[in-house]
């Protein structure tokens, strides 16, 4: 009886997966227009949750209202994920996507 064959050696990857080697590109938090929330409430949320001045919060709210969406924050993935969660908790429609550089 012969001994079992040794397992074939698994080749070691020459490079790491792209997710580990890509630079940490900025991410964007996008707030979308919805038929539910009042403009005054959206402005209030931008002020209290994201820390914008009343003027800047109003500008962003008007962009959401007229264009259908606005980038309301950007940065590293963890920060933007937090902003999206906070806006969603406040009842706004928010998503995130990688900023194209």
UniProtKB/Swiss-Prot annotation:
Positions in coiled-coil regions: none
Transmembrane segments: none
Span of the signal peptide: none
GO annotation, biological process: protein catabolic process; proteolysis
InterPro entries, A to Z: ClpS, ClpS_core, Ribosomal_bL12_C/ClpS-like
Domain of life: Bacteria
Pfam families, sorted: ClpS (PF02617)
Function: Involved in the modulation of the specificity of the ClpAP-mediated ATP-dependent protein degradation.
UniProt subunit comment: Binds to the N-terminal domain of the chaperone ClpA.
Family indicated by similarity: Belongs to the ClpS family.
Protein name, UniProt field: ATP-dependent Clp protease adapter protein ClpS
Species whose genome carries this gene: Corynebacterium jeikeium (strain K411)
Gene that encodes it: clpS
């Amino acid at each position: 009886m012969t001994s079992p064959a040794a397992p074939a050696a698994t080749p070691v990857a020459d490079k790491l997966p792209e997710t580990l080697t890509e630079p940490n590109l900025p991410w964007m938090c996008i707030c979308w227009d919805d038929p539910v929330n009042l403009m005054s409430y959206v402005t209030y949320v931008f002020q209290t949750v994201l820390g914008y001045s009343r003027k800047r919060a109003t500008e962003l709210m008007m962009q959401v209202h007229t264009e259908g969406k606005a980038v309301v924050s950007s940065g590293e993935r963890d920060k933007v994920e937090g902003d999206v969660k906070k806006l969603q908790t406040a009842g706004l429609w928010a998503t995130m996507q990688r900023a194209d550089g």
